[in-house]
A protein has these predicted regions:
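Conserved "HGTGT" condensation-loop signature of ketosynthase/thiolase-family condensing enzymes
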Residues: 1-192
Length: 192
């Protein structure tokens, strides 16, 4: 996955081929498997930003998060329906079943307070929409975010969730092209 126009990739993070591992060290209570995958991918991108020193961001209050996931918390919603029908549900499952939890968990765990959005659509269809939103949040005269974690989440054939996070920042301005010929002097005369 590449950066949208006007943006640069500052870091990448992803779950491993067997699903999330790193995120399970964060105390979050009952969570949907998609939440674990997103939390893991965002944590990996943050670690890359910090040079492997652990998740850190200077000012998370202006960091936006966009997650694209077709399923979101569907697994927990289905489990909640089954448990409710049998009379043995846990109130914690209601929190874990909210689709916004997929985005909100990473925001809470890592202190990210910029704009956030969950696009419930297949990643291949949602990526262009998410990329355009990230570009708009990062650009213009009054940017809404200093960085955007753009996360694509999907279910692997083995059943676990995989997520990839691109940590996007505004692209640096183009360097000014020198129009002056280095073989000419300031006054336009040929140098010897």
């Amino acid at each position: 996955v590449t950066a949208p126009a006007g943006c640069a990739v500052a870091a990448r993070g992803a779950t491993g081929p067997d699903g999330p591992v790193r995120a399970r060290t964060v105390r979050t209570g009952a969570m949907d498997p998609a939440c674990w995958a997103v939390l893991d991918a965002v944590g990996a991108a943050l670690e890359e930003l910090a040079g492997g020193a652990g998740p850190a961001v200077a000012d998370g209050s202006r960091v936006g998060v966009i997650v694209v996931s077709e399923e979101a918390t569907a697994q927990t919603l289905h489990r909640l329906v089954a448990e409710t029908a049998s009379g043995g549900f846990s109130p914690r499952q209601f929190v874990a079943a909210s689709p916004g939890t997929v985005v909100g968990t990473s925001c809470s765990a890592y202190g990210l307070g910029g704009p956030s959005l969950l696009l419930t659509m297949p990643p291949e269809r949602g990526r262009p929409v998410a990329a355009e939103l990230a570009r708009q949040w990062l650009g213009g005269r009054r940017p809404r975010a200093s960085a955007v974690a753009l996360v694509l989440c999907r279910r692997a054939p083995a059943g676990h969730h995989l997520a990839e996070c691109l940590w996007l920042v505004p692209a640096p301005p183009p360097s000014p092209q020198s129009t002056e010929d280095p073989d000419r002097s300031v006054h336009g005369e040929e140098r010897p």
